[in-house]
Amino acid sequence: MLARTIGAAVHGIDAIKVEIEVTVDWGSGFMVIGLPDTAVKESAERVRCAMQQTGFDFPGKKVMVNMTPADIKKEGSAYDLPLAVGILAGDEKINLDRLGRYLLMGELSLDGSLRPIKGALPMAIMARELHLDGFILPRANAMEAAVVNNLKIYGVDNLIEVVQFLNGEIDLTATEVDTRAEFAKAQGVFPYDFADVKGQENVKRAFEVACAGGHNILLVGSPGSGKSMMAKRLPSIMPPLTLSEALETTKIHSVAGKLQQGTTLMTVRPFRSPHHTISPVALVGGGSYPMPGEISLAHNGVLFLDELPEFSRNVLEVMRQPLEDRIISISRAKYSTEYPASFMLVASMNPCPCGYYGHPKKKCVCNEYQRTHYMSKISGPLLDRIDLQIEVQPVDFDQMSSKAPGEPSAAIRQRVIAARMLQERRFKDEPGIHCNAQMTPSLLHKYAEPNAAGLEKLKDAMERMNMSARAYDRILKVARTIADLEGTADVLDHHIMEAIAYRNLDRPTYMGSSL
């Protein structure tokens, strides 16, 4: 007898319908065709044991499974549930009437219980687009999938519940989530606040500019100057996620299996801080079965690279393309996929191997060659893509011991939001452009042209500091953001001067090291 169930395959951060055809006929054996991976082929034993433990007999006949479309790789153990249901339906243990109306996905344990899966959110979106009646999946993923409106989400614990529901023997209660209420609930909740930061007003100002325009930033300073502490507070001054950004961010983390159980929507911008031993594949994504990397997990948030020169040269260089295009393409022999990668890069580093070159109190023990070699680990093209390059000085005792609180993140965030609102209105007719950091050269000419005095100062800096054309564009973008923070329509000379001051590493000789 032929039975059909509906499953899904994740491709990038979207899901594709997979139809699973099962025939149970005379003979013996179990065969799965349709480009399954090893985990899918191994499902026979998991399904057999799960069925036996829940009171069903595995058919003593030939079971043939065909998964279509056949040109898409079927990966993982999440196909256990639709395979088991298809086999039971082919063996006339389940009515066929309701099979084609539900999406089924879930990994089976040997006792017949269901284990969580990856990619439940994009699968639920696909099910709604196909106008299916509902999505039956493990209970642990129900809240995640329930953010999709106009689709019934049935979280179940075991195979028996699914069989009884499809046979009309029991009713399941659909999981419901008020998406907008969930989205609003956790807005503005941050574990770290800039009020805790003593001194460092110039660095806090640079962070404000970076967040207001979506600019990348590099902090250079000795150990203990507060680089990492301030970077961790960055999400607290970034503009809140929009609902569409929250959904897209949650989809990426769903595909990667990074959502905590019971999570509905990610309402705070992600902050990813990979270790410097990370591989290029782990950073940008890929692998035998492509998965999002750290730069995609940081989408709509912050990617913090602490001790930047300690990362391998290959790791740093693979970031150049996604930093420019805000998307990462993974190509394989038979297919390619794309992951979004619109993140704000925040990096920190010491000025030299010992960390104390230029320190007001501690002596550097490095020679000029060591300093030059250390700084040369970061290529010029990568530095060009970092809009703000800030020197972080140690905090003196008077500032550190002061009991006066610093400016709270909430106050800084309000100024950032006001500047972003100006940019949203400015770029409302420009598809794919949301902030100043994303401006194209034509938009720079249109919106960031400085006044005559500013242009003269920029020309002088370009000649004196031997800047590249990309650095020229970055300065104009940052100057436009500074003007937005002031609420001025024109880019003036003092905006240009402040933007140039944020290009520390563009100086011909920085801290004794030629770059």
Language-model region placement:
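Peripheral, non-AAA+ core regions of ATP-driven protein-machinery
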Residues: 1-218, 222-225, 471-472, 489-515
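Short beta-strand elements
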Residues: 18-24, 283, 387-390
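Short loop/turn elements that form and flank the Walker-type P-loop nucleotide-binding site
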Residues: 26, 58-61, 98-99, 131, ...
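Basic, amphipathic alpha-helical bundle interface domains used for macromolecular binding and assembly
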Residues: 33, 39-44, 59, 66-76, ...
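P-loop NTPase nucleotide-binding/switch module
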Residues: 170-209, 213, 240-295
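Walker A/P-loop
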Residues: 219-260, 325
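Walker B catalytic acidic pair
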Residues: 300, 306-307, 318
